[in-house]
Amino acid sequence: MGANPESGALSVAGQLLGLAQRMLDLSVDYAAQRKQFGKPIGSFQAVKHHLADVATALEFAKPVLYRAAYALAHNEPNAAVWVSQARLASCEASWLAARHGIQVHGAMGYTWEVDLQMFMKRAWALDSAWGDRALHKARVAEYVLSGAAPLGCGHTFED
């Protein structure tokens, strides 16, 4: 992989997924420690759903990132589209992790005592690095609407 926009965008996608995972880990730990009404807040359904949403977004974004890395490493003709998909999925996962992390932490999430604010700001800063969402969405839309995109799970590793 050389120094090109796709490599940069793929790198950012990986960083965003790592940030999302770290924000989820911090939120899970905090939900287990913080008590309200004599119980950990992680025992409440609303908190569980927030954390489950983030975990699901992360698990859905990982294979997209891996597929993009494979496409880029093997110089596939549509590697840029795969990278854009990974970039979008990773960005959504990191933003969801930040939003729900703040919900779980409450005001503590913004303080210097909790590292969540640092990871959240990093995710926000990386949001527009190596192409903003509009650029990546346009790239994916152009590919899908061109009719050249073989859609479906049977076409994942085909050219």
Walk through the language-model features, giving the residues of each.
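Alpha-helical interface subdomain recognition
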Residues: 3-159
